[in-house]
């Protein structure tokens, strides 16, 4: 697995990526991700989570023949790709807004088998506005959960 970081890069981000299982870390501001991926043999699949159409456009060149870019992050802008890259190397670009119910079940089953646990940042309910602002600014670390004074996360009643 290779991690390509597009923003908020740095030593702490690289250390986290390696701790989470990355074999390679590519800082897109320091190097060309497509060129670096090709030097590593090319990617079979690139999961593009960044909300940047411009960065998605540059990823196709990092694929090996037959590879695919799956775009799940969006900003509403166009993704520019050349037909030569698609046809001659049999590469593809796909998009998905959410997986199917079966995808969710498969993901949870895989998580149980691999003992994968979510990384959660808890925030007191009184700091909800600050937590929301951090989320909007892209400063939230993984998932943020609002908790009450007793430390319990609560949702709205279902009536």
Predicted features along the sequence, with ranges:
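Short, glycine/polar-rich helix-capping loops at beta-to-alpha or helix-loop-helix junctions
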Residues: 6-16, 78-83, 103-104
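Cofactor-binding loop segments of dinucleotide-utilizing enzymes, especially the Rossmann-like FAD-
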Residues: 6-7, 74, 98, 149
């Amino acid at each position: 697995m290779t991690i390509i970081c597009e923003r908020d890069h740095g030593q702490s981000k690289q250390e986290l990526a390696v701790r989470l299982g990355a074999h390679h870390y590519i800082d897109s501001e320091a190097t060309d991700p497509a060129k670096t991926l090709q030097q590593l043999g090319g990617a079979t699949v690139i999961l593009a989570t960044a909300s940047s159409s411009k960065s998605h456009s540059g990823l196709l060149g990092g694929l090996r023949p037959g590879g695919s870019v799956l775009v799940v992050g969006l900003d509403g802008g166009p993704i520019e790709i050349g037909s030569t890259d698609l046809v001659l190397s049999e590469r593809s670009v796909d998009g998905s807004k959410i997986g199917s119910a079966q995808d969710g079940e498969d993901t949870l089953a895989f998580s149980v088998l691999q003992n994968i646990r979510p990384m959660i940042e808890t925030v007191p309910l009184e700091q909800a506005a600050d937590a929301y602002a951090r989320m909007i600014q892209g400063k939230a670390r993984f998932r943020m959960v609002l908790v009450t004074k007793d430390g319990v996360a609560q949702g709205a009643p279902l009536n």
